[in-house]
Amino acid sequence: WEDLLTDTDGQYIELQSGRVFNQPASNSAYTPYKHYAFAPQMTDEWTEYWYPVKGIQGVSKASRIGALHVTREAGSLKLAFSPLEVLSTDVKIYQDEKLVETLPLNTKVLEPVTLSAAKSIPEGHLKVVIGDDLLVYSENAKDYDLERPMTLPEDFDWNSAYGLYTQGEQWLNQKVWDKAELYLKQAVDKDSYFAPALVRLSSLYYREGRYAEALPLLNTALSLNTYDGEANYLYGLVNRVMGKTAEAKAAFSIASFAASVRTAAYEQLGEMYACEKNWAKAEHYAQKSLEFNEMNLDARQLLMLVYRQTGKTEQAKEQIQYVLDRLPLYHAARFEEAWLAGKHTADQLKDFSSLIRNELPFETYLELAGWYERVGCPDEALALLACAGKYPIALYQSAYLLSQQGKETESKAALEQANAQSPDFVFPFRPETMKYLDWAQTQSPNWKIDYYKGLIYWTNQQKDKALEAMNRCTPTDYAELYLSRAQLKSGQARLDDLLKAEQVETSWRVGFALLNYYTSVSDWQKVTEVGKKYTKLYPKNYYIGLKYANGLCETGQYAACVSLLKKMEVLPNEGSYAGRAVYRAANLYQAMDLIGKRKYASALKSIEASKEWPENLGVGKPYDDQIDSRLEDYLEAKVYDGQGQQEKAKACFNRVAEVKTSPKYFESARLLTALALREVGKQIEADAMVTSWAKDFPDSKPAQWCAAIYKGDTTKASELLKSRYSQQDTTPWEATYRDTNFDLIVRLFK
C-alpha cells in the first residue's frame, strides 16, 4: 500500500514489546495470560522507548542504547549495530560462557556500525555483550526460557462458580460490560455466597449507576466478612452516592485495612470531610492516602484545595508544582494554579483552557466539575462548566447547581439554553449526569432530555430503560434519534424507526443502517434496491458499495457485482476483509451455476478470477502457503470431472485431500477434504476424519452440518442451518479464525 502512505520512505516494520507477556486478545482470558486491571486510585508508571532502526537489515536484540543484528556469512560473524547514543565501549563475544573475543565499539547517534569477529561461533552457543550489560544477546535458550506455566490446566471447569467468575472478571477488565454481567450473574447463581463474584458484580452495577442493585450484593458479601476490603470500599461508594454519610464513612474506614484499596479509601474520607468544610480532617486523610501512594492525584488535588481554602498559599503552590513537574498537562493542578491566582471566570481561565485540546474538551471540564461538586465546591464547578461553552450537558449541570444556590433566574436561562442546543455530537455516559437531567425534566420538559437519558441508560447496559426514555421523545426532525432508537428495537419496530430516519434525513448513515437491517434479515432484494439508491447518492462511499455488491451477489447478479467491485476503491484497514470476500463469492457462485449448466470452460474462468486479490478492494494477498484454496480446487475437480478429464480431476482432488487442518478450530472446508479423500479411494481415512469432528468440536454447528452433508443426511443439515453459526465480534488485531468458506459451501451443496 505504498501509494497510500503519507510519507515517501517506502515500507516499514514496527517492532513492539510491552510490559506483559502478550498483547492480550479476548481469548487470552482462557490462558494464564489474563487481562490486567488497575486498583482504585493507584498510579502505575513505566517508560516506553520508541526509536528508529536503520542500516542493519534486521533486529536480533534491542535495548535502550540501540539495536543489534547478528548474521553469519561465509564462516564469519557479523555484528551490525544501530546506536541511539554516543558510545565508547567494547563488545564481548562469548561461546557459551567462554570469552572468545573483545572488539572496540565507538558510535555516533544513528550511524550504523558493522563489526566482524575473527571466529564464527556455532549457532545456539553465541553470546554478545555490549559494554556493562548495556545490551546482551544470547542464542542459548536457557538464558531466556522460563519454567512458569504457559497453559491452563485441561480440567479447569469454566462452568464452576470460579470459572464463571473468571470469565466475568476478564470481560470486566476488557470493559465489555454486558458479557461481564452475564458471567458474573451466572457465578452468583451457581454459588450465591461466592464473595469475589458478588463484589465484582456490585462494582459493575456501581459503575453503571445501578446503586439499588449493587447494595444487596454488597450486604451479602459483608455478611460473609465484615472486613472485606473491596466490598467495604464499594459499599462506601454506593452509600456516599445515596447520601448515607455515616454508612459511607464507616465503610471507607474499614476498607483502609486492605492494602489494595487503602489509598483510595483514605482519599474518599478526605473528600467527605472537605464537603463538610472540616479542612483539618480532609488534610489528615489526604496525607494518609499519600503515605501509601505518593502519586495519588486525587489526594494531591484534595491537598491543593485544602491549603487554598485554609489560606496556606505556599503549601498549595508546593503541591501544584509537585504534580506539574511530573505531569505538566495534569489539568486539575493547572486549574488550582489558575484559581489560586484569582482567575475565576471563563474569560480569566482562557490560559487554562488553551491547553485542553483533545477531541472532546467539554468532557475534561465535566470530569473536573464533577470532582469539585463532590467535595462541596460549586463555584469552582460552575467556572469549569462555563469553560465548556454551549455543550448541553454542561448547561444542564450548571442550571442544576445554580438552582441549588438559589440563583433561579440564571438557572432558568442556562436550562433554556441547554434545551435549545442541537444534540449533534452530544454523547452523555456518566450515571451521575442523570440527576441533572431528571431535575431538568421537572423544570422544563423537552424531548432532548429523554434522548440524553436514553443514551446514558444505553451505555450503562439498561436497554429497557433506554428504550422507554427514547419512546417518550415526541416526533422530531432529528434523524439520529430514530437511528439510535432503532438499535434498541428488533424486527418491524426497528425497520419503522429506520424508515422514519430516512423520511427526516437523507444521509449515508441512514442508508448504511437500512442496508445492515435488510442484510440481517436476508432480504436481498431490498438490499439491492436500497444499495442502488444510496450508491448513486454516495458513489465513493465503499461501506455502502460493499453492502450493495453483497446484495447483487446474493440475488445472483454476479457479473453486475464484479463490475461494481472493479470500480470501487476500498481503503485498506486493520481487520478488513469484506471487499475481497464478496469478490470471491461472486466468482465462485457464478462458477457453481455454470457447472450446473455444464458450461465448464466459463466455470474455469470464474474459478481463476476468484483466486485474484484486486488491490482496489483493500485486502492484501497473503503468502501462497497461507491461502486455503480447497474450495477452488474442489470446483476445478468437478469441472474436469464433467469434462471427462479424470487425471486432472484426480490431481485437484489430491490437492484438497492433502491439506493439513488446524486442531484449534473447525473450518467448513474440512468437508471438502473428506469428500476429496473419498473421491481418491481413501474412504476409511475420510470416514475416520468425519467421525473425529464430533469428539474434537462437539459444540460446532458447522461441524455437525458438514458431517450431515458427508453422510447424505440433508434433513438434519437443513435443520442445523436454522441455527446459523455467527462469528463472534472481536477487535481487528485479534488472531481470531474467520470461516470464509461456510456460506459458499452451503450454497455448493444446495
Write out the residue ranges for each language-model feature.
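Long, contiguous interaction/recruitment modules in multidomain scaffold/adaptor proteins
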Residues: 60-159, 331-333, 404, 408-433
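Canonical tetratricopeptide repeat
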Residues: 200, 234, 268, 302, ...
